[in-house]
Amino acid sequence: MKLSTALVLGATATGAWSYAIPQLEQEVLELPETHYEQQEKYLIELSPYQTRWVTEEEKWALKLDGVNFIDITEDRNYGLFPTLDAGSYVNYPQKMGYVDTVKGLIAGLSMDNMRKDLENFTSFHTRYYKSSSGVESAQWLYDQVSKVVRDSGADKFGATVQKFDHSWGQFSIIARIPGLSKKTVVLGAHQDSINLFLPSFLGAPGADDDGSGTVTILEALRGLLKSDIVAHGQSPNTIEFHWYSAEEGGMLGSQAIFSKYKKNQADVKAMLQQDMTGYVQGTKHAGQKESIGVMTDFVDPALTSFLKNTIVTYCAIPFVETKCGYACSDHTSASKYGYPSAMATESTMENSNKHIHTTDDKISYLSFDHMLEHAKLTLGFAYELAFAAL
């Protein structure tokens, strides 16, 4: 996830951000002629249809300045936020229909599981998507997801866990729990982390960004598969859990997945992204009530309304509306390819974790009680839509 930060390098972009593009031009010095290897450049989009070619170093400079972007180099000809097809509008339930069942499943969610998983997940030096340890962490996560599915017995009824390979090394992960139709509900988080100062060398435990979201939806998957109806493939709709690679590089992994889904005409009815689910200190220091942040910009309004209803029904804390700006996480990719998306996070943006993208994004700053509330909403969201007439 991209957040504003005070950790700004001298070479970062400057200028206010209100859909104005920070200037990256540098003074040209007269130096002796020297032949340099040309740096690879990437096409990024900083707001709808506002693009720029940048080097990788310029990418990180923008992120340090709190500037969001999506890297569209691989699919630059696809229009962003296209008009949904006439038949693709989704009517989400106006009220929850399976409260007793979902609350029974919620009772089985475990903070101990999330803590253990996050301790292991943050033990890798970095989960930077181009690093060898980023591949190792992805393999560890794949093994955990596979074990959850096997232990539930869902694999005997068609459930699968697949690696979605990418050119940069770290793969994305897709757990698919088939239903009676191909109408699909996606729950997502990103698995990569980054240290913006020297991504290839410095540590990036990424406990909150987005280790917290990763283990939150993993625990929700455990809880969901305790339903025999779901595990046995008898829910009306299909449920998928995604762990995306390379979100920090500009939503690269999620774009690749939703691009393929669009080409294959996948019938995705809803996508919920969970990015940073564990930090509450900022909210408490501000003297505000602990809440779940619900994004209201660049999301689907109807799905966001359903998300709010889910929180009110299944969580012990309220929601608070907030905005993260353009291209702040992987729900952007779902929207880009015409799929309805929503996003939940730990707080309002101004109260969110400022330790991210450094070596200091540690478990010690996080609240597993708060992460449990996010797991509750994830489980409720998934189960209710698994049985909804979408």
Swiss-Prot record:
Alphabetized UniProt keyword annotations: Aminopeptidase, Disulfide bond, Glycoprotein, Hydrolase, Metal-binding, Protease, Secreted, Signal, Zinc, Zymogen
Propeptide residues, chain positions: 19-90
Known EC number: 3.4.11.-
Main location: secreted
UniProt binding sites for Zn(2+) 2: D209, E248, H357
Superkingdom field: Eukaryota
GO CC list: extracellular region
Signal peptide annotation: 1-18
Pfam families in UniProt: Peptidase_M28 (PF04389)
Binding site for Zn(2+) 1: H190, D209, D275
Cofactor: Zn(2+)
Cofactor note: Binds 2 Zn(2+) ions per subunit.
Positions annotated as glycosylated: N120
One record GO biological process: proteolysis
Enzyme class: hydrolase
Family from the record: Belongs to the peptidase M28 family. M28E subfamily.
Subunit-structure text: Monomer.
Protein name: Leucine aminopeptidase 1
Organism listed in the record: Emericella nidulans (strain FGSC A4 / ATCC 38163 / CBS 112.46 / NRRL 194 / M139)
Lineage: Eukaryota, Fungi, Dikarya, Ascomycota, Pezizomycotina
